Protein backbone atom coordinates (compact mmCIF):
# COMPACT_ATOMS: atom_id res chain seq x y z
CA UNK A 1 0.00 0.00 0.00
CA UNK A 2 2.81 2.36 -0.94
CA UNK A 3 1.26 4.42 -3.73
CA UNK A 4 -1.25 7.24 -3.52
CA UNK A 5 -3.67 5.49 -5.87
CA UNK A 6 -3.72 2.45 -3.58
CA UNK A 7 -3.90 4.30 -0.26
CA UNK A 8 -6.08 7.34 -1.01
CA UNK A 9 -9.41 5.54 -0.56
CA UNK A 10 -8.59 3.76 2.71
CA UNK A 11 -10.59 4.68 5.79
CA UNK A 12 -8.73 5.65 9.02
CA UNK A 13 -9.72 2.26 10.46
CA UNK A 14 -8.27 0.43 7.44
CA UNK A 15 -5.05 2.47 7.67
CA UNK A 16 -4.69 1.62 11.36
CA UNK A 17 -5.25 -2.09 10.69
CA UNK A 18 -2.60 -2.06 7.95
CA UNK A 19 -0.11 -0.34 10.26
CA UNK A 20 -0.81 -2.80 13.10
CA UNK A 21 -0.29 -5.77 10.79
CA UNK A 22 3.07 -4.42 9.66
CA UNK A 23 4.32 -3.54 13.16
CA UNK A 24 3.25 -6.88 14.65
CA UNK A 25 4.70 -8.99 11.85
CA UNK A 26 7.47 -11.43 12.82
CA UNK A 27 9.53 -10.23 9.86
CA UNK A 28 9.12 -6.53 10.67
CA UNK A 29 12.24 -4.44 10.07
CA UNK A 30 11.91 -0.64 10.20
CA UNK A 31 14.98 -0.28 7.97
CA UNK A 32 13.61 -2.45 5.18
CA UNK A 33 12.91 -0.08 2.29
CA UNK A 34 9.58 -1.62 1.28
CA UNK A 35 8.22 -1.68 4.84
CA UNK A 36 9.39 1.85 5.56
CA UNK A 37 7.79 3.03 2.34
CA UNK A 38 4.45 1.40 3.21
CA UNK A 39 4.40 2.86 6.71
CA UNK A 40 5.27 6.35 5.41
CA UNK A 41 2.42 6.06 2.91
CA UNK A 42 -0.12 4.96 5.53
CA UNK A 43 0.91 7.60 8.08
CA UNK A 44 0.68 10.23 5.33
CA UNK A 45 -2.91 9.22 4.59
CA UNK A 46 -3.77 9.25 8.31
CA UNK A 47 -2.24 12.71 8.58
CA UNK A 48 -4.30 14.04 5.69
CA UNK A 49 -7.46 12.44 7.09
CA UNK A 50 -6.78 14.06 10.45
CA UNK A 51 -6.82 17.49 8.84
CA UNK A 52 -10.59 17.43 8.50
CA UNK A 53 -10.75 20.91 6.92
CA UNK A 54 -9.35 19.40 3.72
CA UNK A 55 -12.13 18.50 1.30
CA UNK A 56 -9.86 16.41 -0.86
CA UNK A 57 -6.50 14.76 -0.59
CA UNK A 58 -4.07 15.77 -3.32
CA UNK A 59 -1.11 13.78 -4.50
CA UNK A 60 1.42 16.61 -4.11
CA UNK A 61 0.49 17.04 -0.44
CA UNK A 62 0.75 13.29 0.02
CA UNK A 63 4.22 13.23 -1.54
CA UNK A 64 5.39 16.07 0.70
CA UNK A 65 4.18 14.33 3.88
CA UNK A 66 5.45 10.93 2.77
CA UNK A 67 8.94 12.28 2.07
CA UNK A 68 9.28 13.87 5.52
CA UNK A 69 7.75 10.89 7.35
CA UNK A 70 9.81 8.33 5.44
CA UNK A 71 13.08 10.07 6.31
CA UNK A 72 12.26 10.55 10.01
CA UNK A 73 10.28 7.42 10.90
CA UNK A 74 11.56 5.39 13.86
CA UNK A 75 10.07 2.64 16.04
CA UNK A 76 11.04 1.47 19.52
CA UNK A 77 9.77 -2.11 19.60
CA UNK A 78 10.31 -2.62 23.34
CA UNK A 79 8.47 0.50 24.47
CA UNK A 80 6.15 0.56 21.45
CA UNK A 81 6.96 4.16 20.54
CA UNK A 82 6.46 5.46 17.01
CA UNK A 83 8.20 8.70 16.07
CA UNK A 84 8.16 10.73 12.89
CA UNK A 85 8.28 14.29 11.58
CA UNK A 86 5.62 15.85 9.36
CA UNK A 87 5.50 19.11 7.41
CA UNK A 88 3.15 20.94 9.78
CA UNK A 89 3.64 23.77 12.25
CA UNK A 90 1.42 22.28 14.94
CA UNK A 91 1.13 18.55 15.51
CA UNK A 92 -0.65 18.18 18.87
CA UNK A 93 -4.10 17.35 17.48
CA UNK A 94 -2.60 15.11 14.80
CA UNK A 95 -0.66 13.17 17.44
CA UNK A 96 -3.85 12.62 19.46
CA UNK A 97 -5.74 11.43 16.38
CA UNK A 98 -3.07 8.89 15.46
CA UNK A 99 -2.75 7.65 19.06
CA UNK A 100 -6.52 7.10 19.14
CA UNK A 101 -6.24 5.11 15.90
CA UNK A 102 -3.30 3.09 17.31
CA UNK A 103 -4.11 2.72 21.04
CA UNK A 104 -1.45 0.04 21.57
CA UNK A 105 1.36 2.46 20.72
CA UNK A 106 2.71 5.76 21.92
CA UNK A 107 3.00 8.18 19.01
CA UNK A 108 5.33 11.18 18.90
CA UNK A 109 4.79 13.52 15.95
CA UNK A 110 7.23 16.41 15.60
CA UNK A 111 6.73 19.49 13.43
CA UNK A 112 9.07 19.83 10.49
CA UNK A 113 11.98 22.20 11.03
CA UNK A 114 14.66 23.20 8.59
CA UNK A 115 18.15 22.09 9.47
CA UNK A 116 20.35 24.63 11.18
CA UNK A 117 22.66 26.30 8.68
CA UNK A 118 25.40 28.86 8.97
CA UNK A 119 24.94 32.59 8.46
CA UNK A 120 26.70 32.36 5.09
CA UNK A 121 24.52 29.47 3.88
CA UNK A 122 21.34 31.26 4.98
CA UNK A 123 22.43 34.37 3.10
CA UNK A 124 23.09 32.36 -0.06
CA UNK A 125 19.75 30.55 0.19
CA UNK A 126 17.71 33.74 0.59
CA UNK A 127 19.38 35.23 -2.49
CA UNK A 128 18.81 32.23 -4.73
CA UNK A 129 15.14 33.00 -5.26
CA UNK A 130 13.51 36.39 -4.96
CA UNK A 131 10.00 37.09 -6.27
CA UNK A 132 10.90 40.69 -7.08
CA UNK A 133 13.91 39.43 -9.06
CA UNK A 134 11.62 37.18 -11.10
CA UNK A 135 9.21 40.02 -11.79
CA UNK A 136 12.08 42.25 -12.84
CA UNK A 137 13.34 39.65 -15.30
CA UNK A 138 9.96 39.41 -17.03
CA UNK A 139 9.74 43.19 -17.18
CA UNK A 140 13.21 43.27 -18.76
CA UNK A 141 12.26 40.62 -21.32
CA UNK A 142 9.22 42.60 -22.46
CA UNK A 143 11.13 45.87 -22.43
CA UNK A 144 13.51 44.52 -25.05
CA UNK A 145 10.80 42.96 -27.23
CA UNK A 146 7.15 44.06 -27.18
CA UNK A 147 5.91 41.24 -29.42
CA UNK A 148 5.32 38.38 -26.99
CA UNK A 149 5.32 35.74 -29.73
CA UNK A 150 8.78 36.76 -30.95
CA UNK A 151 10.01 36.07 -27.43
CA UNK A 152 8.31 32.68 -27.44
CA UNK A 153 9.60 31.87 -30.94
CA UNK A 154 13.17 32.63 -29.88
CA UNK A 155 12.91 30.16 -27.00
CA UNK A 156 11.14 27.53 -29.14
CA UNK A 157 14.07 27.59 -31.59
CA UNK A 158 16.17 25.86 -28.94
CA UNK A 159 13.82 22.87 -29.07
CA UNK A 160 14.61 22.37 -32.76
CA UNK A 161 18.33 22.81 -32.12
CA UNK A 162 18.81 20.68 -29.01
CA UNK A 163 15.98 18.14 -28.65
CA UNK A 164 17.05 14.69 -29.79
CA UNK A 165 13.57 13.29 -30.52
CA UNK A 166 10.58 14.67 -32.41
CA UNK A 167 8.40 13.65 -29.46
CA UNK A 168 10.28 15.90 -27.05
CA UNK A 169 10.24 18.77 -29.54
CA UNK A 170 6.47 18.46 -29.90
CA UNK A 171 5.91 18.15 -26.13
CA UNK A 172 8.10 21.12 -25.21
CA UNK A 173 6.66 23.32 -27.93
CA UNK A 174 3.06 22.53 -26.96
CA UNK A 175 3.83 23.16 -23.28
CA UNK A 176 5.50 26.50 -23.97
CA UNK A 177 2.95 27.81 -26.49
CA UNK A 178 -0.04 26.42 -24.61
CA UNK A 179 1.03 27.93 -21.28
CA UNK A 180 1.71 31.34 -22.84
CA UNK A 181 -1.41 31.39 -25.02
CA UNK A 182 -3.70 30.39 -22.15
CA UNK A 183 -1.87 32.08 -19.28
CA UNK A 184 -2.10 28.74 -17.51
CA UNK A 185 -0.17 26.42 -15.27
CA UNK A 186 1.60 23.32 -16.55
CA UNK A 187 -0.88 21.21 -14.59
CA UNK A 188 -3.80 22.79 -16.48
CA UNK A 189 -2.36 21.49 -19.75
CA UNK A 190 -1.40 18.15 -18.25
CA UNK A 191 -4.80 17.49 -16.70
CA UNK A 192 -7.06 18.60 -19.54
CA UNK A 193 -9.41 15.86 -20.68
CA UNK A 194 -8.79 14.91 -24.35
CA UNK A 195 -12.36 13.65 -24.64
CA UNK A 196 -13.63 17.22 -24.17
CA UNK A 197 -11.91 18.66 -27.26
CA UNK A 198 -14.42 20.60 -29.35
CA UNK A 199 -14.54 23.18 -32.13
CA UNK A 200 -15.55 26.65 -31.06
CA UNK A 201 -16.15 29.64 -33.31
CA UNK A 202 -14.28 32.65 -31.96
CA UNK A 203 -15.93 35.83 -33.24
CA UNK A 204 -12.52 37.26 -34.23
CA UNK A 205 -10.31 34.26 -35.01
CA UNK A 206 -12.86 31.92 -36.57
CA UNK A 207 -12.93 28.19 -35.71
CA UNK A 208 -10.58 27.23 -32.89
CA UNK A 209 -10.20 24.14 -30.71
CA UNK A 210 -10.67 24.04 -26.96
CA UNK A 211 -10.80 21.46 -24.17
CA UNK A 212 -11.89 21.46 -20.54
CA UNK A 213 -9.76 20.92 -17.46
CA UNK A 214 -11.43 20.41 -14.08
CA UNK A 215 -8.35 19.68 -11.94
CA UNK A 216 -7.12 23.27 -11.68
CA UNK A 217 -5.34 24.81 -8.71
CA UNK A 218 -8.58 26.47 -7.62
CA UNK A 219 -10.71 23.44 -8.59
CA UNK A 220 -12.77 25.73 -10.82
CA UNK A 221 -12.86 24.27 -14.32
CA UNK A 222 -11.57 26.26 -17.27
CA UNK A 223 -11.04 25.96 -21.00
CA UNK A 224 -7.64 25.53 -22.61
CA UNK A 225 -7.76 27.05 -26.11
CA UNK A 226 -5.73 26.32 -29.24
CA UNK A 227 -6.05 29.16 -31.74
CA UNK A 228 -4.29 30.92 -34.64
CA UNK A 229 -1.34 33.17 -33.83
CA UNK A 230 0.27 35.61 -36.25
CA UNK A 231 3.72 34.20 -36.96
CA UNK A 232 5.31 30.81 -36.34
CA UNK A 233 3.76 30.15 -32.91
CA UNK A 234 0.32 29.02 -34.05
CA UNK A 235 -1.23 26.96 -31.26
CA UNK A 236 -3.30 24.87 -33.67
CA UNK A 237 -0.18 23.87 -35.61
CA UNK A 238 1.53 23.00 -32.33
CA UNK A 239 -1.47 20.85 -31.39
CA UNK A 240 -1.30 19.11 -34.79
CA UNK A 241 2.40 18.33 -34.34
CA UNK A 242 1.80 16.98 -30.83
CA UNK A 243 -1.07 14.69 -31.83
CA UNK A 244 0.97 13.40 -34.80
CA UNK A 245 3.86 12.02 -32.75
CA UNK A 246 2.62 11.63 -29.16
CA UNK A 247 0.40 8.88 -27.79
CA UNK A 248 -2.56 9.13 -25.40
CA UNK A 249 -1.67 8.94 -21.71
CA UNK A 250 -3.82 7.17 -19.14
CA UNK A 251 -4.98 9.41 -16.30
CA UNK A 252 -2.94 9.17 -13.13
CA UNK A 253 -4.62 9.48 -9.75
CA UNK A 254 -3.96 12.97 -8.38
CA UNK A 255 -6.55 13.19 -5.60
CA UNK A 256 -9.09 11.08 -3.76
CA UNK A 257 -11.93 12.71 -5.68
CA UNK A 258 -13.79 10.30 -7.96
CA UNK A 259 -13.43 11.05 -11.66
CA UNK A 260 -14.56 9.48 -14.91
CA UNK A 261 -11.62 11.01 -16.80
CA UNK A 262 -9.69 8.21 -18.50
CA UNK A 263 -6.80 10.15 -20.07
CA UNK A 264 -4.66 13.20 -19.40
CA UNK A 265 -2.93 15.26 -22.07
CA UNK A 266 0.72 15.62 -21.03
CA UNK A 267 3.13 13.26 -19.23
CA UNK A 268 3.66 13.59 -15.47
CA UNK A 269 7.42 14.00 -15.87
CA UNK A 270 7.30 16.68 -18.56
CA UNK A 271 7.51 19.67 -16.21
CA UNK A 272 10.75 18.33 -14.72
CA UNK A 273 12.47 17.58 -18.04
CA UNK A 274 11.19 20.84 -19.56
CA UNK A 275 12.60 22.85 -16.64
CA UNK A 276 15.94 21.07 -16.90
CA UNK A 277 16.08 21.75 -20.64
CA UNK A 278 15.45 25.48 -20.22
CA UNK A 279 18.13 25.73 -17.53
CA UNK A 280 20.74 23.91 -19.61
CA UNK A 281 20.07 25.16 -23.13
CA UNK A 282 18.29 28.54 -23.12
CA UNK A 283 20.48 31.55 -22.44
CA UNK A 284 17.88 33.65 -20.65
CA UNK A 285 18.60 35.11 -17.16
CA UNK A 286 15.16 34.20 -15.81
CA UNK A 287 15.93 30.49 -16.32
CA UNK A 288 19.10 30.78 -14.26
CA UNK A 289 17.23 31.83 -11.11
CA UNK A 290 17.30 28.99 -8.61
CA UNK A 291 13.79 27.58 -8.24
CA UNK A 292 12.54 30.26 -10.62
CA UNK A 293 9.64 29.83 -13.07
CA UNK A 294 10.37 27.40 -15.88
CA UNK A 295 7.36 25.17 -16.50
CA UNK A 296 5.38 28.19 -15.26
CA UNK A 297 7.26 30.60 -17.51
CA UNK A 298 4.28 30.91 -19.86
CA UNK A 299 1.75 32.16 -17.36
CA UNK A 300 4.21 34.63 -15.83
CA UNK A 301 5.13 35.99 -19.26
CA UNK A 302 1.51 36.39 -20.39
CA UNK A 303 0.45 37.94 -17.07
CA UNK A 304 3.25 40.50 -17.33
CA UNK A 305 2.48 41.16 -21.00
CA UNK A 306 -1.22 41.82 -20.39
CA UNK A 307 -0.48 43.98 -17.35
CA UNK A 308 1.95 46.11 -19.37
CA UNK A 309 -0.65 46.34 -22.15
CA UNK A 310 -3.30 47.71 -19.78
CA UNK A 311 -5.14 44.38 -19.89
CA UNK A 312 -4.17 43.38 -16.37
CA UNK A 313 -7.79 42.95 -15.33
CA UNK A 314 -7.80 39.65 -17.20
CA UNK A 315 -5.13 38.00 -15.06
CA UNK A 316 -4.36 37.44 -11.42
CA UNK A 317 -0.99 38.26 -9.91
CA UNK A 318 0.02 34.61 -10.30
CA UNK A 319 -1.05 34.31 -13.90
CA UNK A 320 -4.44 32.78 -14.51
CA UNK A 321 -7.58 34.15 -16.09
CA UNK A 322 -9.32 36.23 -13.44
CA UNK A 323 -12.90 35.83 -12.31
CA UNK A 324 -15.12 36.36 -9.32
CA UNK A 325 -16.75 32.96 -8.91
CA UNK A 326 -16.35 31.21 -5.57
CA UNK A 327 -13.24 29.07 -5.21
CA UNK A 328 -13.56 26.05 -2.90
CA UNK A 329 -10.06 25.87 -1.44
CA UNK A 330 -9.23 28.53 1.15
CA UNK A 331 -5.56 28.42 0.18
CA UNK A 332 -6.34 28.77 -3.52
CA UNK A 333 -8.83 31.53 -2.76
CA UNK A 334 -6.08 33.46 -0.99
CA UNK A 335 -3.48 33.06 -3.70
CA UNK A 336 -5.16 32.28 -7.03
CA UNK A 337 -7.81 34.45 -8.65
CA UNK A 338 -8.80 32.03 -11.42
CA UNK A 339 -12.55 31.60 -11.30
CA UNK A 340 -13.68 31.82 -14.92
CA UNK A 341 -14.43 28.97 -17.29
CA UNK A 342 -14.47 31.16 -20.40
CA UNK A 343 -12.57 34.24 -21.49
CA UNK A 344 -13.86 37.06 -23.70
CA UNK A 345 -13.13 36.44 -27.41
CA UNK A 346 -11.51 39.89 -27.57
CA UNK A 347 -8.71 38.72 -25.27
CA UNK A 348 -7.62 36.08 -27.77
CA UNK A 349 -8.00 38.56 -30.63
CA UNK A 350 -5.52 40.84 -28.88
CA UNK A 351 -3.14 38.07 -27.85
CA UNK A 352 -3.12 36.44 -31.30
CA UNK A 353 -1.26 39.36 -32.86
CA UNK A 354 -3.73 39.66 -35.73
CA UNK A 355 -5.71 42.49 -34.14
CA UNK A 356 -5.05 45.84 -32.53
CA UNK A 357 -7.21 48.13 -30.45
CA UNK A 358 -9.01 50.76 -32.52
CA UNK A 359 -8.20 54.44 -31.87
CA UNK A 360 -11.62 54.82 -30.26
CA UNK A 361 -10.55 52.42 -27.54
CA UNK A 362 -13.11 50.66 -25.34
CA UNK A 363 -11.59 47.35 -26.46
CA UNK A 364 -12.81 47.61 -30.03
CA UNK A 365 -10.42 45.55 -32.14
CA UNK A 366 -9.60 45.77 -35.83
CA UNK A 367 -7.19 43.79 -38.01
CA UNK A 368 -3.63 45.13 -38.04
CA UNK A 369 -3.34 44.14 -41.70
CA UNK A 370 -6.55 43.29 -43.62
CA UNK A 371 -4.51 41.12 -45.98
CA UNK A 372 -3.20 39.03 -43.08
CA UNK A 373 -5.95 37.43 -41.07
CA UNK A 374 -6.70 34.03 -39.52
CA UNK A 375 -8.07 31.25 -41.70
CA UNK A 376 -11.84 31.60 -41.86
CA UNK A 377 -14.33 28.78 -41.87
CA UNK A 378 -15.08 29.55 -45.53
CA UNK A 379 -11.39 29.10 -46.41
CA UNK A 380 -11.24 25.81 -44.53
CA UNK A 381 -14.24 24.51 -46.45
CA UNK A 382 -13.63 26.06 -49.86
CA UNK A 383 -13.92 23.66 -52.79
CA UNK A 384 -10.60 24.51 -54.45
CA UNK A 385 -8.25 21.69 -53.47
CA UNK A 386 -10.64 20.82 -50.67
CA UNK A 387 -10.34 17.20 -49.61
CA UNK A 388 -13.26 17.60 -47.24
CA UNK A 389 -15.73 17.30 -50.09
CA UNK A 390 -18.05 19.84 -48.47
CA UNK A 391 -19.55 22.98 -50.02
CA UNK A 392 -18.64 26.41 -48.68
CA UNK A 393 -20.57 27.26 -45.53
CA UNK A 394 -21.53 30.56 -43.97
CA UNK A 395 -20.20 31.09 -40.46
CA UNK A 396 -22.77 30.89 -37.67
CA UNK A 397 -24.30 34.16 -36.55
CA UNK A 398 -23.23 33.71 -32.94
CA UNK A 399 -19.80 32.67 -31.66
CA UNK A 400 -20.98 29.38 -30.21
CA UNK A 401 -19.87 25.86 -30.93
CA UNK A 402 -19.55 25.00 -34.60
CA UNK A 403 -22.06 22.20 -35.07
CA UNK A 404 -21.45 21.46 -38.76
CA UNK A 405 -19.43 18.25 -39.07
CA UNK A 406 -16.48 17.90 -41.37
CA UNK A 407 -16.79 14.89 -43.65
CA UNK A 408 -14.25 12.06 -43.69
CA UNK A 409 -10.75 13.38 -44.06
CA UNK A 410 -7.97 11.32 -45.67
CA UNK A 411 -5.44 12.64 -43.16
CA UNK A 412 -7.41 11.26 -40.21
CA UNK A 413 -5.14 8.22 -40.19
CA UNK A 414 -2.36 10.53 -38.99
CA UNK A 415 -4.09 10.62 -35.61
CA UNK A 416 -5.16 6.98 -35.51
CA UNK A 417 -3.96 6.50 -31.93
CA UNK A 418 -6.26 9.31 -30.76
CA UNK A 419 -9.31 7.86 -32.52
CA UNK A 420 -12.06 7.19 -29.99
CA UNK A 421 -10.55 9.63 -27.48
CA UNK A 422 -10.68 12.90 -29.40
CA UNK A 423 -13.71 13.20 -31.69
CA UNK A 424 -13.13 12.58 -35.40
CA UNK A 425 -14.66 15.96 -36.18
CA UNK A 426 -11.97 17.74 -34.15
CA UNK A 427 -9.16 15.61 -35.57
CA UNK A 428 -10.40 16.26 -39.11
CA UNK A 429 -10.56 19.98 -38.44
CA UNK A 430 -6.99 20.05 -37.07
CA UNK A 431 -5.69 18.12 -40.10
CA UNK A 432 -7.46 20.42 -42.55
CA UNK A 433 -6.33 23.54 -40.70
CA UNK A 434 -2.72 22.35 -40.93
CA UNK A 435 -3.10 21.64 -44.68
CA UNK A 436 -4.69 25.00 -45.50
CA UNK A 437 -2.19 26.83 -43.30
CA UNK A 438 0.64 25.21 -45.27
CA UNK A 439 -0.97 26.14 -48.60
CA UNK A 440 -1.36 29.74 -47.52
CA UNK A 441 2.29 29.87 -46.39
CA UNK A 442 3.43 28.54 -49.78
CA UNK A 443 1.38 31.16 -51.63
CA UNK A 444 2.88 33.88 -49.44
CA UNK A 445 6.42 32.70 -50.23
CA UNK A 446 5.69 32.62 -53.98
CA UNK A 447 4.15 36.08 -53.87
UniProtKB/Swiss-Prot annotation:
Keyword field: DNA integration, DNA recombination, Plasmid
InterPro entries: DNA_brk_join_enz, Integrase-like_cat_sf, Recombinase_Flp_C, Recombinase_Flp_N
Classification via Gene3D superfamilies: Intergrase catalytic core (1.10.443.10)
Pfam family, one: Flp_N
Region of interest (Disordered), residue spans: 376-401
GO BP field: DNA integration; DNA recombination
Recorded GO MF terms: DNA binding
Domain named Tyr recombinase Flp-type: residues: 130-417
Signal peptide: none
Active site annotation, chain numbering: 336 (o-(3'-phospho-dna)-tyrosine intermediate)
Top-level division of the source organism's lineage: Eukaryota
Stated role: Catalyzes the recombination between the large inverted repetitions of the plasmid.
Similarity comment text for this entry: Belongs to the 'phage' integrase family.
Protein name: Recombinase Flp protein
Amino acid sequence: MSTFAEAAHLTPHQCANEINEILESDTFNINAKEIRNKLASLFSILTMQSLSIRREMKINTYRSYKSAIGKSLSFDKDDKIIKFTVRLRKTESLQKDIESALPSYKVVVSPFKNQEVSLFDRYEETHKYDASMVGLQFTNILSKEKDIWKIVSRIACFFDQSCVTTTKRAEYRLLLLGAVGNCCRYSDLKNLDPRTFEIYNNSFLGPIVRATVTETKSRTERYVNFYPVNGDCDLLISLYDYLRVCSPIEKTVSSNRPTNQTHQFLPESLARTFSRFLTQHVDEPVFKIWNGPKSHFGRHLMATFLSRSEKGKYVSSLGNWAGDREIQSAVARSHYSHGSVTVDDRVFAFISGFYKEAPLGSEIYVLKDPSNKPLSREELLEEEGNSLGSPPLSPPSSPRLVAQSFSAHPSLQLFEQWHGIISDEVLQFIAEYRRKHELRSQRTVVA
